[in-house]
Design a protein with these regions (language model features):
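N-terminal donor/sugar-recognition subdomains of glycan-related enzymes
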Residues: 1-186
Length: 186
């Protein structure tokens, strides 16, 4: 329990204590982050690394008008279990598409995560895609945070390259189709 009397998540690692919610006013950083995001378009993908401070997800889900897609990657099964005991997801999931990916659960490795994300990211929504790594997660789960960030970056780059390739070759493919159509009739 923090100074304000609210339940918070704190984790000890390497003899250091990490507060995932903050000692004071745990709602304030999430509220400010949500304001900075502004209005989100319909189906905007929002990637969140970690649910140790569920207030970011809560702020996003409760204060976004359009239906968006929220992809949450949690590197700790224990933190995810605590999260499930703390919040009521039903109203958030009625309003938005929320995908939880928890490292350590069966079938939830990074390769399968990549396949899932590939189905969500499109060239059209790349410009409005948002990312958040919950504060202190980069210290607690450094390697996972780097892997998550690289994966998202690589998938975005791949989508841009694929789009540019389609644009470049679409004219050539149309010309080839028309030029070779006469052979199809033979």
């Amino acid at each position: 329990v923090n100074i304000d009397g609210e339940k918070i998540t704190k984790i000890q690692k390497d003899n250091k204590l990490f507060y995932l919610d903050g000692k004071r006013q745990p709602n304030e950083p999430a509220r400010i982050w949500r304001q900075v995001l502004g209005n989100l378009r319909k189906n905007t993908p929002v990637f969140i690394f970690g649910v140790g401070n569920y207030r970011y997800l809560k702020e996003l889900a409760e204060n976004t008008v359009n239906r968006i897609t929220i992809i949450v990657y949690e590197p700790s099964v224990l933190i995810f279990k605590f999260f499930l005991q703390t919040v009521n997801l039903e109203t958030w999931m009625e309003k938005h598409t929320i995908i939880f990916w928890v490292k350590g659960l069966e079938g939830m490795d990074i390769k399968n995560f990549e396949n899932t994300v590939r189905g969500i990211l499109t060239y059209d929504n790349l410009g409005c895609t948002k990312y958040l790594i919950i504060p202190n997660y980069e210290k607690l789960f450094y390697e996972d945070a780097v892997e998550f960030s690289k994966l998202c970056r690589d998938l975005m780059m791949r989508e841009v390259v694929n789009y540019n390739t389609r644009q470049l070759f679409s004219g050539i493919m149309a010309k080839n189709l028309l030029m070779n159509a006469r052979y199809l009739c033979d």
